[in-house]
Each structure stands twice: as structure tokens, then as C-alpha cells.
């Protein structure tokens, strides 16, 4: 199923393309929860879920940080949802023209995105795509196990975008090392996320950890 044209049209027709692209990127984290046999059924499922709430003040802080950022690192998660990530990255580039590096797993765990999937959807045609350098399967990102290249990019970045629960579970423990310049995009899939973020199960989570922007915490 070719999802991209459907998603692209949703963004193009939106009153706020970035807001819609962010929501779609988070909804991509719920592909494993969706049941759709046809493109029309998938489109209807996505449109229904686009009504899910996403706090405007949190989104506004994210947008403000994007405006001030020249270098971004985007940690991808699962293979299927990187089509959604590509759409968000394209939207960010069109609006703010930052330098973006998309990081995939060197070794997949189950359905993790790798260079193969990123190249298949053409991610490498719009941004630089690199592996995280972790030797062995790990459903997340531990910076001490990542390559020197990834760590150097993280240090020099103005903003890190972390996609999915696996990346949140690992990177959240490294906030101080990340200098509080990270935004987590994920779906509230379980009780621990509900307790941590105060976001109902199956709802959208955008959590910002910024050093210099006020009023930007999710919880």
C-alpha cells in the first residue's frame, strides 16, 4: 500500500501543515494498532485519529525550537512508520531549511527501520541517513553504544527528535547528556506512559525537554 500520497495530501490541505505532519508522525507509531485492508480504509482510519488532541502550547514550543534550529538529528523507530517521518522531515525542511540527519538501527530488532527501508522510501534523497552504529539488536538508542559519528552529531545539534517508545525508554535516561534539547514523539501505548505523561492510552504524546524555552514540559 502506497501511503505517501495519501499522507502528503492531508498535509498539503491542512490549515497548519506542520501541526498536521507532527500528528501524522506520531500516529505512524500506531501502525501496529491499525487494521486496514485498503488505501481508503487506511485513509479513513488516519483521518479519524487526526482529531486526537495535541496540546497547542507544547506544539508551539516545539515549533519555536524548530525555527531556531540549524542542525537536527532525527532518531527513527519502526520500518513502516518512517513514511510518516519522511513527511514530517520534508515539512520541516520546506518551512525552516535546517540540516537534518536521520538515524536508523544498524541491527534491527523485529521491525526496526534500517538503511534498507530508509533507502526504499527515498529518505536518503531528502536528508542524510546513517546507522546508529550499535553492534547488535537493541530496541532503542543508548548513546554510549552509538558510533562516534552519531555522538558528535548529537553534541552539535540544536534539536533532537526522538520517535517511538523504544527510543523514549532509552534516551529519556540520558536527558542531561543531551543538554535538554530533545523532543519525543510517540503514542501512549501503555500504563507506564499514561502515568509518566498524563496522556490517555492511544493518545498522542509530544514531550519537549528544552533548556531555554519556558512552559514546554508535557507533564
Segments (PLM) and residue ranges:
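Structural motif
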Residues: 71-73, 158-159
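Electropositive, gly/pro-rich neighborhoods at or near active sites that engage anionic ligands
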Residues: 1-71, 82
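Residues at the starts of beta-strands that form the adenosine-phosphate
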Residues: 70-71, 97-102, 181
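Short, small-residue-enriched loops and turns at beta-alpha junctions
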Residues: 52, 108-111
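Histidine-anchored nucleotide/phosphate-binding helix
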Residues: 79-97, 101
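C-terminal functional extensions of proteins
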Residues: 104-106, 114-219
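Short, hydrophobic/aromatic alpha-helical segments in well-folded domains
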Residues: 61-65, 75, 88-89, 149, ...
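Gly/Ser/Thr-rich loops at beta-strand to alpha-helix junctions
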Residues: 75-86, 107-109, 165-169
Amino acid at each position: 500500500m502506497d501511503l505517501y500520497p495519501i499522507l502528503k495530501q492531508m498535509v498539503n490541505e491542512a490549515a497548519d501543515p506542520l501541526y498536521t505532519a507532527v500528528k501524522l508522525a506520531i500516529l505512524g507509531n500506531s501502525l501496529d494498532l491499525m487494521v486496514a485492508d485498503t488505501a481508503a480504509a487506511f485513509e479513513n482510519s488516519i483521518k479519524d485519529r487526526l482529531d486526537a488532541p495535541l496540546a497547542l502550547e507544547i506544539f508551539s514550543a516545539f515549533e519555536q525550537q524548530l525555527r531556531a534550529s540549524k542542525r537536527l538529528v532525527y532518531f527513527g523507530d519502526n520500518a513502516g512508520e518512517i513514511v510518516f517521518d519522511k513527511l514530517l522531515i520534508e515539512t520541516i525542511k520546506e518551512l525552516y531549511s535546517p540540516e537534518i540527519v536521520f538515524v536508523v538501527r544498524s541491527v534491527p530488532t523485529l521491525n526496526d527501520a534500517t538503511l534498507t527501508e530508509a533507502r526504499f522510501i527515498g529518505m536518503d534523497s531528502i536528508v542524510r541517513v546513517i546507522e546508529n552504529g550499535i553492534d547488535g539488536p537493541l530496541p532503542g538508542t543508548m548513546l554510549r553504544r552509538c558510533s562516534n559519528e552519531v555522538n558528535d552529531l548529537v553534541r552539535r545539534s540544536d534539536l533532537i527528535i526522538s520517535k517511538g517508545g523504544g527510543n523514549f525508554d532509552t534516551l529519556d535516561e540520558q536527558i542531561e547528556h543531551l543538554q535538554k534539547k530533545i523532543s519525543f514523539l510517540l503514542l501512549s501505548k501503555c500504563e507506564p506512559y499514561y502515568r509518566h505523561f498524563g496522556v490517555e492510552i492511544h493518545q498522542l504524546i509530544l514531550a519537549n525537554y528544552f533548556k531555554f524555552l519556558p512552559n514546554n514540559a508535557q507533564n
